[in-house]
C-alpha cells in the first residue's frame, strides 16, 4: 500500500477511472473560463479550424484532476504540487469522449532538508479509441516515512 514517499518506486504506474465528457460540460466550462466560439457554440465551431465543438485545453487539464485524485497516487496524503512540466494538448477532446489517464513515476528526489520527497509523474490522458489527447508532468511533494533514511528506503539520489 502506498502511504509515503518511501513507498513509491521509479517506473510505478497508475491508471485512473474513466469518465465521459459531455457537450454540456464543455460549454459550461468554456462559458466561464475560455469563452471562444469553438468551445461554446456548436454551429459556430463547425466553421473554425476545429471543425466542431471541442473542449478547452484548460478544461481537459481540470478534467484530469479528479480522475488522478481517485487513484490516490500518494495514499492518504493530499496531492501538493510545486509545478508542472511538459504540458501538451495532443488531440482534440470532443463531446462524448470517454477519458482516462495513465501515469508513470519518472523521478523521485528525497529532500535533504525537509521530511518529504519530490515526485515527477508523467500523466497521459487517452480517449476511448486509445488516442493520447493530453499529457503533463506535475511535480508533487509527498511526506517521508517518519525516521527513515534514504539508505533504508532504497531511494537512490
Locate each region found by the language model.
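Hot-dog-fold acyl-thioester-processing enzymes
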Residues: 1-82, 147-150, 157
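HotDog/MaoC-like acyl-thioester-processing domains
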Residues: 2-10, 89-152, 156-157
Amino acid at each position: 500500500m502506498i502511504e509515503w514517499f518511501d513507498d513509491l518506486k521509479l517506473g510505478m504506474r497508475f491508471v485512473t477511472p474513466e469518465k465521459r465528457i459531455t457537450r454540456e460540460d464543455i460549454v459550461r466550462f468554456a462559458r466561464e473560463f475560455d469563452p471562444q466560439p469553438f468551445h461554446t457554440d456548436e454551429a459556430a465551431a463547425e466553421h473554425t479550424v476545429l471543425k466542431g465543438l471541442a473542449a478547452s485545453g484548460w478544461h481537459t487539464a481540470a478534467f484530469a484532476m479528479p480522475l488522478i485524485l481517485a487513484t490516490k497516487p500518494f495514499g492518504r496524503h493530499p496531492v501538493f504540487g510545486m509545478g508542472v512540466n511538459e504540458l501538451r494538448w495532443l488531440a482534440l477532446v470532443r463531446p462524448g469522449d470517454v477519458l482516462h489517464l495513465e501515469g508513470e513515476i519518472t523521478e523521485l528526489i528525497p529532500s535533504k532538508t525537509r521530511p518529504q520527497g519530490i515526485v515527477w509523474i508523467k500523466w497521459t490522458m487517452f480517449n476511448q479509441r486509445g488516442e493520447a489527447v493530453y499529457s503533463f508532468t506535475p511535480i508533487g511533494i509527498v511526506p517521508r516515512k517518519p525516521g527513515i533514511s534514504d539508505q533504508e528506503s532504497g531511494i537512490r539520489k
